[in-house]
Amino acid sequence: MSNIGIDVKAPENVCEDPNCPFHGTLSVRGQIFEGIVTSDKGHDTIVIKREVTGYISKYERYEKRTTSLVAHNPACIKAKVGDTVKVMECRPISKTKSFVVIEKTENLE
């Protein structure tokens, strides 16, 4: 198991995935986001929704928006729908996947 450079709890399971930052050769860098898994139907892929708050100066109010990210789900983490996960930026794995799950924090269901 390799050290990925940030302070997260390493997964207990072991996988043979080459795109796993812990057991494979995928290096992670850049931004870290936290969100809720809304879909896990793709092969080793999850969709994450996260809320973004923005300030509108004309109305002096804040607005909530949701954005979705597509991330790689390694076999050692296996996040499911309803889980809260942390994802980190990596090199592009496919056309839409440029993030990988690094930690599963809790399940809301």
Curated annotation (Swiss-Prot):
GO terms, biological process: translation
GO annotation, cellular component aspect: cytosolic small ribosomal subunit
Keywords: Ribonucleoprotein, Ribosomal protein, RNA-binding, rRNA-binding
Molecular function terms from GO: rRNA binding; structural constituent of ribosome
Entry keyword RNA-binding: yes
Matching Pfam families: Ribosomal_S17 (PF00366)
Function of the protein: One of the primary rRNA binding proteins, it binds specifically to the 5'-end of 16S ribosomal RNA.
Subunit record text: Part of the 30S ribosomal subunit.
Similarity section: Belongs to the universal ribosomal protein uS17 family.
Cited NCBIfam families: PRK08572.1, uS17_arch
Name of protein: Small ribosomal subunit protein uS17
